[in-house]
Structures are given as C-alpha cells and as structure tokens.
Amino acid sequence: MAKPNPNKQSVELNRTSLYWGLLLIFVLAVLFSSYIFN
C-alpha cells in the first residue's frame, strides 16, 4: 500500500498486452477469412 506505482505499472502492462493480443487475434481472423473466401 505504501508503493502503488509498481502495481499500477504492472496492471497497465497487462492491459496493454491484452489489447495487443486481441488486435493480433483480430488481424489473424481477418487474414484467415480472406484466405478462405478467396
């Protein structure tokens, strides 16, 4: 409780990595669907 900065940093890092993971899954889904329908 005395040092909230490292905990806040780790939470922001996890949120950023989660957003990158969702973006990567979205891009792969678009590429896969375009490959299937072509």
From Swiss-Prot:
InterPro entries in UniProt: PSII_PsbL, PSII_PsbL_sf
Tagged with keyword DNA-binding: no
Transmembrane spans: 17-37
Subcellular location: Plastid, Chloroplast thylakoid membrane
GO BP: photosynthesis
Major localization listed first in the record, in broad terms: plastid
Keywords: Chloroplast, Membrane, Photosynthesis, Photosystem II, Plastid, Reaction center, Thylakoid, Transmembrane, Transmembrane helix
Family, similarity comment: Belongs to the PsbL family.
NCBIfam families to which the protein is assigned, alphabetical: PRK00753.1 (NF001972)
Protein function: One of the components of the core complex of photosystem II (PSII). PSII is a light-driven water:plastoquinone oxidoreductase that uses light energy to abstract electrons from H(2)O, generating O(2) and a proton gradient subsequently used for ATP formation. It consists of a core antenna complex that captures photons, and an electron transfer chain that converts photonic excitation into a charge separation. This subunit is found at the monomer-monomer interface and is required for correct PSII assembly and/or dimerization.
Quaternary context: PSII is composed of 1 copy each of membrane proteins PsbA, PsbB, PsbC, PsbD, PsbE, PsbF, PsbH, PsbI, PsbJ, PsbK, PsbL, PsbM, PsbT, PsbX, PsbY, PsbZ, Psb30/Ycf12, at least 3 peripheral proteins of the oxygen-evolving complex and a large number of cofactors. It forms dimeric complexes.
Protein name listed in UniProt: Photosystem II reaction center protein L
Gene name as annotated: psbL
